[in-house]
């Protein structure tokens, strides 16, 4: 479609129908060899990650883990089928979206299987535990995926081409994961049960665990988070004071040009500064040039102010004349005007604000308690600030994938929060005036702890493999995601419930309030139980 539009525009211009002069505001030239290597390494990472994920699920969950393995294979096949049928452009971030989606697809399975274990541990038969586990896990799975879909939708609306690709594959993956988690796995589980696999030992059961007093560390958790965020702010202030940018903004945010050479040998940072950068300055007639070496490779990127086509050609000719590039590679250039970078900044801010507001509204509607919504949003703000602090510490480039990274973390983090809040809400429905709210919250956190740990591990497996095997741009995207997943798990366990508790959840009135809501609407499951 875009090619046809471009051809039509070119035709109009040639015949003089449109009296205008074209001005380059953004351009990108990428070597085919780099693209091929990046896609190949990402696909291999996906295959290895999927194999490790399946092994982990089988070891931890036995028969349900085997079911999860089959559902993951079906999930991956369906996602790739939909990408092919609808001719979706598969960018590097798009592939990352598929890989991340595989990790997140396991989330639903873990929620269901930990529920089944709880039901078996409570004395129910395997058949009854399967039915009850699926029914009780449905709302959590739907809520978690809807919040991620909100983030994907916002990314698609405000993102550029590569980010749109990531948002598309992430959204497709979320929709497919709901289907595979709630339909496919249930069918396979029932078939295995009907074929005679009925012994509880094949499904596992939760052993009694002492309730952890998580609320007792809420003050220290808050202090620790505040220290990390403050350190990030101080780091940004110091960088600004030294004349650098507070964060390592890439071209998308500040505008300018990046020229990347893959030399035939590796040069040290000092050699580049003393020998190559002066050649670039003289060729283009500029003063400010920044270098960025790619670890364990001969690739070097040079950031400058906006360059004209003539300046870019002059740099390429001057540098390659003295410092030959590797055979089979080309000089890659990327230019973004200040007008485009201003738009990117605006869209980045709007996307985070809009996604946060949408999630707040959704959580409020689902839980009918503004305290749950406020606690969740404050936790999301915490996660975003901690990851931004990490960007400041590590000086990772902040570009368009930064938006995708932040909204993915927001969408993922809210999943863990919803699971705990859902358990608190469930226990509040059966609570009375004598119920100790502190114990209720601690019990809810403890009972969902295994789910938080397992889902974090499954997602981290995919991300770590992708980080190890991916190209530089993929590493810069996955590393903050890894940090975000860990931070999200921490905030879900240590902060969100504590904030709800402090904001009034600890009061006796919250029990009476929720009992009234429960009386007006009871959830009845297929096995006849009520919650």
Q: Locations of the language-model features?
A:
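A structural signal for conserved, well-ordered secondary-structure elements
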Residues: 1-531
């Amino acid at each position: 479609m875009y090619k046809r539009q471009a051809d039509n525009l070119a035709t109009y211009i040639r015949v003089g129908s449109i009296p205008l002069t074209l001005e380059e505001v953004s351009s990108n030239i990428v070597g085919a060899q780099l693209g091929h290597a990046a896609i190949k390494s990402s696909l291999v990472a996906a295959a290895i990650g999927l194999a490790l994920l399946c092994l982990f699920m089988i070891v931890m969950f036995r028969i349900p883990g085997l079911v999860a393995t089959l559902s993951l294979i079906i999930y991956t096949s369906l996602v790739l089928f939909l990408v092919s049928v609808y001719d979706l452009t598969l960018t590097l971030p798009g592939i990352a979206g598929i890989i991340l989606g595989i990790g997140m697809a396991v989330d639903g399975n873990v929620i269901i299987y930990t529920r089944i274990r709880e039901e078996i541990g409570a004395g129910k038969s395997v058949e009854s535990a399967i039915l009850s586990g699926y029914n009780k896990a449905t709302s959590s799975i739907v809520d978690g995926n809807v919040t991620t879909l909100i983030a994907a939708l916002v990314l698609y609306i405000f993102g550029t081409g590569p980010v749109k690709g990531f948002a598309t594959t992430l959204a497709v993956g979320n929709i497919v994961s709901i289907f595979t988690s709630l339909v496919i796995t249930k069918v396979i589980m029932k078939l295995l049960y009907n074929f005679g696999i009925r012994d509880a030992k094949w499904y596992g059961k939760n052993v009694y665990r002492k309730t952890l007093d998580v609320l007792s560390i809420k003050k220290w958790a808050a202090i620790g988070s505040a220290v990390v965020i403050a350190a990030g702010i101080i780091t940004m202030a110091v960088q600004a004071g030294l004349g650098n940018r507070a964060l390592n903004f890439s071209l998308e945010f500040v505008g300018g040009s990046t020229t990347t050479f893959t030399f035939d040998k590796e040069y040290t940072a000092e050699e580049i500064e003393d020998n190559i950068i002066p050649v670039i300055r003289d060729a283009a007639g500029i003063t400010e040039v920044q270098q960025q070496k790619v670890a364990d490779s001969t690739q070097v990127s040079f950031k400058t102010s906006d360059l004209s086509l003539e300046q870019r050609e002059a740099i390429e000719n001057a540098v390659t004349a003295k410092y030959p590039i590797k055979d089979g590679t080309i000089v890659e250039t990327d230019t973004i005007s200040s007008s485009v970078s201003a738009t990117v900044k605006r869209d980045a801010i709007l996307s985070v604000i809009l996604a946060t507001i949408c999630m707040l509204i959704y959580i409020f509607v689902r839980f009918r308690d503004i305290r749950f919504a406020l606690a969740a949003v404050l936790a999301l703000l915490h996660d975003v600030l901690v990851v931004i602090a990490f960007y400041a510490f590590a000086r990772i480039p902040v570009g368009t994938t930064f938006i995708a990274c932040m909204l993915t973390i927001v969408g993922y983090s809210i999943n863990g929060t919803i699971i705990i809040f859902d358990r608190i809400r469930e226990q509040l429905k059966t609570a009375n005036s004598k119920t100790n709210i502190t114990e209720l919250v601690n019990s809810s956190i403890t009972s969902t702890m295994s789910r938080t740990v397992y889902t974090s591990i499954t997602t981290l497996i995919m991300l770590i493999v992708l980080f190890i095997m991916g190209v530089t741009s993929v590493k810069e995207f996955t590393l903050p995601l890894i940090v975000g997943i860990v931070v999200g798990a921490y905030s879900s366990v240590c902060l969100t419930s504590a904030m709800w508790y402090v904001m009034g959840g600890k009061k006796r009135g919250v029990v009476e309030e929720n009992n009234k809501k429960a009386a007006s609407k009871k959830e009845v499951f297929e096995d006849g139980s009520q919650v």
